[in-house]
């Protein structure tokens, strides 16, 4: 079952989170890898915000109030863009986890909305895999030594 989610900035924690939208936010249970998950609050996001977004294979924590640990997706359409060509975005996100200024939250949120939620599929350990940290569960975050090539959750 595809989960309909949107990218939403949490200014209190300065992280980007995924919030369920559409049917899930209206109270229907969400089916996950560990069975049916409780529905999040309908006030998490406006019903029409990001309603065109659809992702498969979300981690269980994606449905928590804190948002997901990380999502592992790759995009054939965007993989060769300037942003991804030199692993710029993973470096940016790594700096953000360290509290360093690298990219404005507005620019980062716009990038996720424009690029990462279009034509993405979960591809396991594919060579061009990128793991984008969208907030929540920071203690599970692991990053390879600089230059940071990818993120993963422990």
Curated annotation (Swiss-Prot):
Instruction: Return the InterPro entries for the record.
Output: Transactivation_prot_X
Which keywords label this protein?
Answer: Activation of host NF-kappa-B by virus, Activator, Apoptosis, Host cytoplasm, Host G2/M cell cycle arrest by virus, Host mitochondrion, Host nucleus, Host-virus interaction, Modulation of host cell cycle by virus, Transcription, Transcription regulation
Metal-binding recorded as keyword: no
Q: Where in the cell is it found?
A: Host cytoplasm; Host nucleus; Host mitochondrion
Tell me, in one coarse class, where this protein mainly resides: host cell
The job of this chain, per UniProt, is described as:
Multifunctional protein that plays a role in silencing host antiviral defenses and promoting viral transcription. Does not seem to be essential for HBV infection. May be directly involved in development of cirrhosis and liver cancer (hepatocellular carcinoma). Most of cytosolic activities involve modulation of cytosolic calcium. The effect on apoptosis is controversial depending on the cell types in which the studies have been conducted. May induce apoptosis by localizing in mitochondria and causing loss of mitochondrial membrane potential.
Concerning its family, UniProt says: Belongs to the orthohepadnavirus protein X family.
This one is known as: Protein X
Q: What is the lineage of its organism?
A: Viruses, Riboviria, Pararnavirae, Artverviricota, Revtraviricetes
């Amino acid at each position: 079952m595809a989960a309909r989610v949107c990218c939403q900035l949490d200014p209190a924690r300065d992280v980007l989170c995924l919030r369920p939208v559409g049917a899930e936010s209206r109270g229907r249970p969400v089916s996950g890898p560990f069975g049916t998950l409780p529905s999040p609050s309908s006030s998490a996001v406006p019903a029409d915000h990001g309603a065109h977004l659809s992702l498969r294979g979300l981690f269980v924590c994606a449905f928590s109030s804190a948002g997901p640990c990380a999502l592992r997706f790759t995009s054939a359409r965007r993989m060769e863009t300037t942003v991804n060509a030199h692993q710029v975005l993973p470096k940016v996100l790594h700096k953000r986890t360290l509290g360093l200024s690298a990219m404005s939250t507005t620019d980062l949120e716009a990038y996720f909305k424009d690029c990462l939620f279009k034509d993405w599929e979960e591809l396991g350990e594919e060579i061009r895999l990128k793991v984008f940290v969208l907030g929540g569960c920071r203690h599970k975050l692991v990053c390879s030594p600089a230059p940071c090539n990818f993120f993963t959750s422990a």
